[in-house]
């Protein structure tokens, strides 16, 4: 998802003077945190994918 679509004003935000309007800054921060987490997972997978996968697989394949 692009930053433009995350921070685009919603319907009814024509004049920008609505005191209850949400700016989308928190949404961008959440998206950035998710991107950082995915980058960390990618780096772990690149270095040791087998151990990463085994940590999620229980005995018996469950």
UniProtKB/Swiss-Prot annotation:
Is modified by deamidation of its C-terminal glutamine to glutamate by the deamidase Dop, a prerequisite to the subsequent pupylation process. Protein modifier that is covalently attached to lysine residues of substrate proteins, thereby targeting them for proteasomal degradation. The tagging system is termed pupylation. Strongly interacts with the proteasome-associated ATPase ARC through a hydrophobic interface; the interacting region of Pup lies in its C-terminal half. There is one Pup binding site per ARC hexamer ring. There is a cross-link at residue 62 (Isoglutamyl lysine isopeptide (Gln-Lys) (interchain with K-? in acceptor proteins)). Residues 21-56 are annotated as: ARC ATPase binding. Keywords: Isopeptide bond, Ubl conjugation pathway. GO terms for biological process: modification-dependent protein catabolic process; proteasomal protein catabolic process; protein pupylation. The modification Deamidated glutamine is found at residue 62. Pathway: Protein degradation; proteasomal Pup-dependent pathway. Belongs to the prokaryotic ubiquitin-like protein family. Pfam families: Pup. The N-terminal unstructured half of Pup provides a signal required to initiate unfolding and degradation by the proteasome but is not needed for pupylation, while the C-terminal helical half of Pup interacts with ARC to target proteins to the proteasome. Residues 1-29 are annotated as: Disordered. One of its GO terms (molecular function) is proteasome binding. This is Prokaryotic ubiquitin-like protein Pup.
